[in-house]
Amino acid sequence: MEIEVLAERAQLTVEQVKAIESDGPLPGLAPLIKIARVLGVRLGTFLDDQQSVGAVVSRAQDERESVRFSNHAAEGHENMIYHSLSEGKDNRHLEPFVIDILPDQNPKFDLSTHEGEEFIYVLDGQVEINYGKNTYVLEKGDSIYYDSIVKHHVHGYNGQKARILAVIYTPI
């Protein structure tokens, strides 16, 4: 499939698709979800290459960085580190991650939207979630569950670092 066709079907710009292909900082999870939907593959296809039909166990001592994303679609710095908790699980529909949100003093960010649902549980720090016209501040132990088709953005409250558990469901 040509890059222009992929971009159009995924409702992305050609520049966004080229940035993803170039192995530079990824602009966020939403563009990958949109591309996966267009290609008819699961999101995990882009994140890991080993497949297991049975149970997949993630051990704390084995935690490793899966992928880094920028919280700002137009900028190149990365401030979200995703640790996959389902790496290698074949045919999964849920994508559980522990996400380290790094300090970021840039107040500008782009809201994202994609099909599916998200559940977020705050493990450490505080996060601010813009969801539609609402803003929620969550502290350690708080959680939120929402439809991700509504425009949303997750970041550290007042630019501070935080750590969350995020479970993302994306229909294929």
Regions found by a protein language model. Give the residues of each.
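Residue-level signal for the short linker/turn that defines the boundary of a DNA-recognition helix
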Residues: 1, 12, 27-30, 136
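Short alpha-helical DNA-recognition segment
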Residues: 1-19
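DNA major-groove recognition helix of helix-turn-helix/homeodomain DNA-binding modules
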Residues: 30-45
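Short amphipathic recognition helices of helix-turn-helix/homeodomain-type DNA-binding modules
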Residues: 45-56
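Conserved short histidine dyad/triad with adjacent acidic residue
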Residues: 62-72, 78-88, 96-114, 148-151
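Ligand-binding loop in jelly-roll beta-barrel domains
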Residues: 78-81, 139-140, 148-172
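Short acidic-glycine-tyrosine-enriched beta hairpin
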Residues: 85, 132-148
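Glycine- and acidic-residue-biased ligand/ion/polar-headgroup-sensing regions
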Residues: 114-132
